[in-house]
Structures are given as structure tokens and as C-alpha cells.
Amino acid sequence: MDDADALQLCLERDRLLSDPEFARSPIMCKLLRFLVDYKLSGNSVPLKSYIIATDALGRNANFDPKTDSYPRVQMVRLRRMLDNFYLRNGGENRLVIAPNQYAIALEPNRP
């Protein structure tokens, strides 16, 4: 990721975080920040439910992704919030998280 892409990613994250819907949800803000920071770090390890739970959502090291769906539920919630934000606000770019994935991406916004 070059500097211009990183800047656009940060600007879009900040735009989302300043939205009242996101501001009312500290968990979604924390998760969004984590996903963007992870992308910016260039970490090549694919995100998994365990990493999301322990590093982003505060679960302890004993977290078992086979029995606890909390990170998956929060990711679905975040995807929904992203979709709603872009329906309301539009914009040139948008942050997306593909279904069944945890990695965030910046893409051109399609009407």
C-alpha cells in the first residue's frame, strides 16, 4: 500500500468515526480502528476470528471461536453499519469487508 492509499484509508476511517451512528457505538469504532490499523501495518497474517476477538474486542486468550460467535456477530454488524453509512452519505470511496472475510478494503463507491 502506497502513502496515497494509506492516506485515503485513514481519511475514510475518520469520516466514518465522526458519524453520529458510529459515535454511539464504541465497539464498532474500536473494531473499525483495529481493522484499518491492521491493514496499514502490512501484516501478512490473515485475520481470523480469534485475532479479532482477543486483539480488537477484548476477549481473553482462552477465547474459543468454535463456541463463541461474538466476533462474527460484530463483523456482520459492522458491515451493516458501513452499508447504511454509505447509503446515507455517499462519497467517492468506501470501506468494505467482504462476506466471510475480516480484511477491510478501500474501494470506489458505486451508486
What function would you assign to each model-found segment?
Residues 1-110:
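An N-terminal, helix-rich hydrophobic module
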